[in-house]
Regions:
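Residue-level signal for inorganic ion chemistry
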Residues: 28, 81, 103, 166, ...
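Short loop/edge segments at beta-strand edges and connector loops
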Residues: 41, 118-120, 190-192
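Conserved SAM/SAH cofactor-binding pocket of Class I
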Residues: 55-143, 149
C-alpha cells in the first residue's frame, strides 16, 4: 500500500499532501536525534501510527473549524490533520518548550499555517479568549479519558466537540468517564473504531459533544485532574 492508497480513504482538500508528509517524516527523524520527539522511527510505522492515525478524525471536523490540539507533542494529531485539511484553523498547545521550538521550525519547512502555544492545558484554558472558544478540541495525549475531558472540554464551544484518540478497547474507560464528562458539560456522541493499515493495530475515537457550559471551577489546578480525576 503506497501513500496515495493509504490516504485516499480520508477527506482531503490538499493535493500535495504526499510531499508534505515526506518533509514531515524527514524533519521529524532528523530532529529526533537532538530532541526526543518519538520512539517510532521506522518509516512505515511513522506513516501509519502517527500520520494516518492522526488523520482519522478528519471526517468529523466541520469545514473551516477552529481546532486546538492539547498536548500535541511532535504535532500529533494536529499537523497531519492540517496537511490534509488546509481549511481548518489549527492551534497547537504543549507544556514543553523544546516541542514548540520544533513545531515552529516544522511550520516553515511545511509552508503551512498554525499557531503554537507553550502552555499547560489548565493555563491555556484560564485565558478568557480560549475558554469555550473552539469548535473542535483534539488530543492524542496519554491520559485517562476523565482526565483528558477535564483539560479539554472547557475549551469547547457549546455545540462543538472534543475528539479523544484512544487505543482499541476503551469501553470500560468510557463507562468510567461518563460522570466526569456529564459534570464538564459533555455527552458521548459516538465511539468510532478503526483498524490501521498493514495490520498495525486498532484505534478508537471518542467523540464528545458539548451540550452545556463547563462550570468555572474546571479544569482544576495543581495537577488534580490526574491525581484525583472526576
Amino acid at each position: 500500500m503506497n501513500t496515495t492508497e493509504m490516504f485516499s480513504v480520508l477527506k482531503s482538500n490538499n493535493t500535495n499532501f504526499e510531499e508534505k508528509f515526506e518533509i514531515y517524516f524527514n524533519e521529524l527523524i532528523d530532529y529526533n536525534t537532538k530532541v526526543n520527539l518519538t520512539a517510532i522511527t521506522d518509516k512505515e510505522d511513522v506513516y501509519i501510527k502517527h500520520f494516518f492515525d492522526s488523520c482519522l478524525a478528519s471526517e468529523f471536523i466541520p469545514n473551516n473549524a477552529q481546532v486546538v490540539d492539547i498536548g500535541t507533542g511532535a504535532g500529533f494529531p494536529g499537523v497531519p490533520l492540517k496537511i490534509i485539511r488546509n481549511d481548518i484553523n489549527l492551534n497547537l498547545v504543549d507544556s514543553l518548550n523544546k516541542r514548540i521550538v520544533f513545531l515552529d521550525y516544522l511550520k516553515q519547512k511545511l509552508d503551512i499555517d498554525y499557531s503554537t502555544y507553550h502552555s499547560r492545558a489548565e493555563e491555556f484554558c484560564s485565558d478568557a479568549k480560549n475558554r469555550e472558544g473552539y469548535e473542535v478540541v483534539v488530543s492524542r495525549a496519554v491520559a485517562k479519558l476523565n482526565t483528558l475531558a477535564e483539560y479539554c472540554l472547557p475549551l469547547v464551544k457549546l455545540g462543538g466537540m472534543f475528539i479523544a484518540y484512544k487505543g482499541g478497547d476503551v469501553e470500560q474507560e468510557v463507562n468510567e468517564s461518563l460522570n466526569a464528562i456529564k459534570i464538564l458539560g459533555g455527552q458521548v456522541q459516538e465511539v468510532k473504531n478503526f483498524n490501521l493499515p498493514m495490520e498495525k493495530g486498532s484505534r478508537t475515537l471518542v467523540i464528545i459533544k458539548k451540550v452545556k457550559l463547563t462550570p468555572k471551577v474546571y479544569p482544576r489546578g495543581k495537577n488534580l485532574p490526574k491525581i484525583k480525576p472526576l
